[in-house]
Amino acid sequence: MNSLIPPPTSEQQMNMFRLRDKMSLLNAEFLKVINGYFTEKNHYDFSGTMKSYMDHVAQLKQIYKVDDDVAADMTVPRRTENSSESSGETVAPRKIAKAVRKNGTPKNPLNSTVFAASSPAATVASVPKFGDISVITKETPAPLAKTAEPLVAPAAPATARKRAIRGGGPLGGAESVVFKSGEDGQAATSSVKIPATTIKFPEPTKDFWTKKSDAPAAPSNSGSLFAFLGKDGDKPKETPKFSGFSFGKKPAEPSEEPKAADSTPKLTFGSPKEADLPKPASSLFGASPSKPLVFGGSSADSTTSAPKPFSALSTAASLFGSSSASTTTTATQPLSFGSSSTGGSSLFSGFAGLAQKAMENQNQAKPEGSGEDDEGEYVPPKVETVENQEPDAVLSSKVSVFKFTGKEYTKLGVGMLHIKDNDGKFSVLIRAATATGTVWLNSLCNKAMKATVVDAKGDRIRLTCPSSSTEMATMMIRFGTADGAKKFTDKILEVAV
């Protein structure tokens, strides 16, 4: 009879599962390295890599305390079980090792607590590497679950707790010890106080609950600006009588008996004679005028033929408060502006004469042959060009200057361009062709200065040169002729060193 083989404990089984997990990772990394080297160059010698692999396997077995015999037995557990059943031998009962807490963590008063399992106590000085390709540690620590802080106060610690061992599995996960209280079914009381509601609604007005009548309110006339118009809608509106100013003939009215004499003075222009003035009559406005209203000169002869101004007004009452005399010899004529066709004077005939005289004076003031067509387009006066000369200039020319600012060329105006010789050092000077002679450019001729022809005609030059120690200026210079532009470019090429 074969000797009885004791079954492995739970700790040995967990170590075996962990060893298998690490071996699967090691084999995957090993094959990855071998394939990489083989793909790079297939004539590599893999003896060093194989030796490192064997050292890793031996190190893993030493860490998890697994011998070769135990590993071989764990690979075929079912065959051993079948053989034992067929032989009729009794198998010893399986032993379960007690879970021992090795990290020394204090007890937590909460109902449920999860602790990470500790690694085996075996320590190794160093772990071989695949040439800094991968590192295999003793145990991959399980990630700790991040628990949020409880919002309510924890319940009182339970007196009786149950302990359960969880973890492991075929991939060798971390073990955990879970403690459960016997009072899990009871609901924990919360100590958080909910603040009282402080929302305050606005109070209703006094007449909020009072029902308003649908009948329209009677308008009150007291204190109103238009109080005198109150209750006018009840009275029928009457058409007002016309008693104003009119420019037509008066409608026909029953004729009255002609009056013998008119006591109201006539409306005349000029200074009347004392003998012709009638006695003053009472005015409509309550005041007795001492003199009649006069707008011009009047004569005694023009009593019947001259038409009266404002003769179309009513004879009963005048606009100015005087009653007109009865029409005896001449018919009433409407109000007219200008000279009268009957030869009599009009109220506005003097104004027409003044306007005609003003037109004649204006025509006489204009010279002969003058008119609006003779006025040409306004031409601004031209700025006088001053050609300033430089005593030490080797080349001078009158040019039009444009400066490149932003994204376009801006015209500066007409100026004088000089190439000056100062003790063997040449410089380009451009001044405005004015009395002040504003300096637009003063740059030393060096290798940074470039003069380039920019058109087919050859009279435009683009000059690029340093205007200061940190800035470059670009000028467009237009010469009078292409020959002048060529002389300038040749001179720049000669002296720009």
Swiss-Prot record:
Q: What's one GO-annotated cellular component?
A: nuclear membrane
Q: Which UniProt keywords apply?
A: Membrane, mRNA transport, Nuclear pore complex, Nucleus, Protein transport, Translocation, Transport
Where in the cell is the protein located? Nucleus, Nuclear pore complex; Nucleus membrane
Region annotation Disordered: where it falls in the sequence: 76-95, 210-308, 359-379
Q: How does it sit in the membrane?
A: Peripheral membrane protein
Q: Which CDD domains match?
A: RanBD_NUP50
Renumbered residue ranges of the record's region RanBD1:
390-497
One GO biological process term: mRNA transport
Q: Return the Basic and acidic residues bias intervals.
A: 231-240, 250-260
What's the subunit arrangement here?
Answer: Interacts with importin beta imb-1. Interacts with DNA-directed RNA polymerase III subunit rpc-1. Interacts with TATA-box-binding protein tbp-1. Interacts with GTF3C5 homolog tftc-5. Interacts with GTF3C3 homolog tftc-3.
- Describe the task this protein carries out: Component of the nuclear pore complex. Plays a direct role in nuclear protein import. Required for anoxia-induced prophase arrest; may function in concert with cdk-1 to arrest prophase blastomeres in response to anoxia.
Protein name according to UniProt: Nuclear pore complex protein npp-16
Organism equals: Caenorhabditis elegans
Q: Lineage, please?
A: Eukaryota, Metazoa, Ecdysozoa, Nematoda, Chromadorea
The gene for this chain is npp-16
